[in-house]
A protein has these predicted regions:
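Extreme N-terminal, non-catalytic leader segments
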Residues: 1-6, 33
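Walker A (P-loop) phosphate-binding loop of P-loop NTPases
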Residues: 14
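Hydrophobic positions on the alpha1 helix immediately C-terminal to the Walker A/P-loop
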Residues: 20
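NTP-dependent small-molecule kinase module
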Residues: 2, 25, 138-193
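A glycine- and Lys/Arg-enriched "phosphate-lid" helix/loop adjacent to the NTP-binding pocket
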Residues: 99-166
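Hydrophobic anchor at the beta1->P-loop junction of P-loop NTPases
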Residues: 9
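Conserved lysine of the Walker
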Residues: 17
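ATP-dependent small-molecule kinase phosphotransfer cores
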Residues: 33-122
Length: 193
């Protein structure tokens, strides 16, 4: 593993990913450590255009189109991220595990299709650490209620998010490598040192 790792933050809506990645970014900045922070979907200019299309409240893509849009965003991002790979710490808000959790466990897309395209896009780009944020159903609902703007992914029924969160937890059990489940307290303690 490099001293300039790729660190991914995963989890369902309202689980604290954005808070955690922002805390780590502030910590790295305080320590004068070079880093780049991106989100998926989104990140580079073309990926942000795709993000708007995916998250538009009125968008109603079928599950395969939805998958391909997410992977198109990833492909665009990786063109940019490869310039910094092993040169800067790379922080990513959602990545390949989100694709599997949402598209496969949430929407039922064939896992073989997801893995095939993901592997084709990723090639030699490897994640060093994945931090999985989990949240209870009640806390997720409360957190989504206070959001100022909601996208179409914030408006699914709670049982959808529970399926997705179970998907993340299944991935963590299967992979057993580099996925760490975090609480807000742990990450804030780490970054406040």
């Amino acid at each position: 593993m490099s001293n300039k790792p790729v660190i991914v933050f995963e989890g369902i809506e309202g689980s604290g990913k954005s808070l955690h990645i922002s805390s780590v970014a502030k910590y790295l900045k305080r320590k004068n450590i070079d880093f780049i922070k991106v989100r998926e979907p989104g990140g580079c200019i073309n990926s942000e255009k795709i993000r708007k299309l995916i998250l538009e409240k009125k968008s109603n893509f079928n599950k395969i189109t939805d998958l391909l849009l997410y992977l198109a965003s990833r492909s665009e991002n990786l063109d940019q991220l490869k310039k910094y790979y092993k040169k800067k710490v790379i922080l990513i808000d959602r990545f390949k595990d989100s694709t599997i959790a949402y598209q496969h466990y949430g929407f039922g897309v064939d896992i073989k299709l997801i893995n095939f395209i993901n592997n084709f896009i990723l090639k030699d780009f490897n994640v060093d650490y994945t931090f999985l944020n989990t949240v209870s159903k009640n806390n997720m609902i409360q957190r989504l209620k206070i959001r100022k703007s909601l996208n179409r992914y914030d408006k699914f029924k709670s049982n959808f998010y529970q399926k997705v969160q179970r998907g993340f937890l299944n991935l963590a059990k299967k992979i057993k490598v580099n996925i760490k489940s975090l609480t807000q307290i742990k990450i804030l303690n780490i970054t406040n040192q």
